[in-house]
Amino acid sequence: MNNAPDGAELLRVAQKVLREHLLPGIAENHRYQALMVANAMAIAARELKAGETDLHQELRMLTQLYGDTMVGESGNSVKDKVASLNKRLAKDIRSGVLDGACAQGVRALLKAQVKARLRISNPKYLKAVGLE
């Protein structure tokens, strides 16, 4: 049994040490860079915590829109499938293929994608605007 902290936890601890113990002693001309490092560590920790869960959810939503396209293809990772379907989605949005009956589903998908990305990159914003 492995009781060691995982990568996300290690990043959170390192970020806390940086912010609480090291940052106060850093020269003013290096504070901005240190804060950027701390923020990058927080984003990386949230990405690790989310793992592939967000990707699987995004794939599920894309396959609801397009059917089981690519789901059974061997050799493609979930990440590759999501990337390919998102390219198709962008092309279809630009061409107007998804206007009409699909428009509501496309809006829901795009909103979910943006929320998932904001949960990782800027979760405080989601709370500030009442989306979480």
Model-predicted regions and their roles:
Residues M1, P5, R31, N76:
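Charge-dense, low-complexity intrinsically disordered segments
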Residues M1-K16:
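An acidic intrinsically disordered interaction segment
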Residues E47-Q64:
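Short, charged early-sequence alpha-helical segments and their helix-coil boundaries
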